[in-house]
Amino acid sequence: MPPASGTRRHRGRSSTCVYCFARKTHSYLDLDTGVGFDTQIVVKVNAPELLRRQLASPRWQGEHVAMGTNVDCYQRAEGRYRLMPGILFALRERANPFSILTKGTLILRDLDLLRQSAEVTDVGVSVSVGFTDTELWRTVEPGTPAPQRRLDVVRTLTGHGIGCGVLMAPVIPFLGDEPAQLRATVRAIAAAGATSVTPLALHLRPGAREWFMAWLGQHHPHLVRRYERLYADGAYAPKWYQRRITRQVHELAEEYGIGPTRAGMPRRIAQPGPTDPTEPDGSAGAVGPAVGAAGAGPVQLTLI
């Protein structure tokens, strides 16, 4: 596991978003960042074993491990390769704090293991839901679970005593940032029982920028010039725009009773100790973005 970057279980995404900032990573392997990123998935099948070695190293200080921060660790490929149960078991075995960010409903497959982990260490979960507009979802996030299904994940996790926040990302300029759209999204997040909501405006890094702008030109050509102006200075929307979105979402979160800047609070839940999920009678555990850490800052564990 490379220092300060974690292990890469998969690179590329079978559950594609036209704006995905991780597209650039495919170029490091001389692969296409457009269609290639969507269809050519590179899998590190020995990720659980590599993690176990890293956690057992005398140099490891129990740093918080953040998963899903580059590409989704619960994308479709995980259904086939089943790497997360072994990874979660390794973290639970060492009582190592961790977090997971995901758009995937497959996290519920590992619910038991997540609960078991939460008994011995700090575990947090965050689900990414940038908007609830189904038409926008169909065009900009093809292959991902519908926003309502992701909110059902939040509802299920919180129903089992596992605090789950929502990363409201991306807020897409001129397509998903109208006041009524923001209100509808925050209202739905609150109804799902999220412990927090954190807005993040769309950012367009190299690789993602070219792919997104091509998509925009095809589906919303009248917005191309506006985007060129808004993102003229780089990958990120201007500070004034980010502040406006953050203020609006925080006000709505307060109105609906959500703590907008609190991380999802980890829970410790009494549960019998797990068996190794790689054994025939092993149990799978729950997964989710976690908060809480030990030692220095979080170490990124990129699985997919």
Language-model regions, residue ranges each:
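Conserved strand-turn element in the central/C-terminal portion of the radical SAM core barrel
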Residues: 132-134, 141-143, 156-178, 202-204
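Auxiliary Fe-S-binding modules of radical SAM enzymes
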Residues: 1, 174-304
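Amphipathic alpha-helical segments that form well-ordered structural scaffolds
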Residues: 50, 90, 156, 244, ...
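Surface-exposed amphipathic alpha-helices with a cationic face
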Residues: 115-118, 154-159, 250, 254
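Conserved Radical SAM active-site core
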Residues: 1-10, 18-126, 130-138, 147-151
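A structural motif
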Residues: 95-96, 162, 194
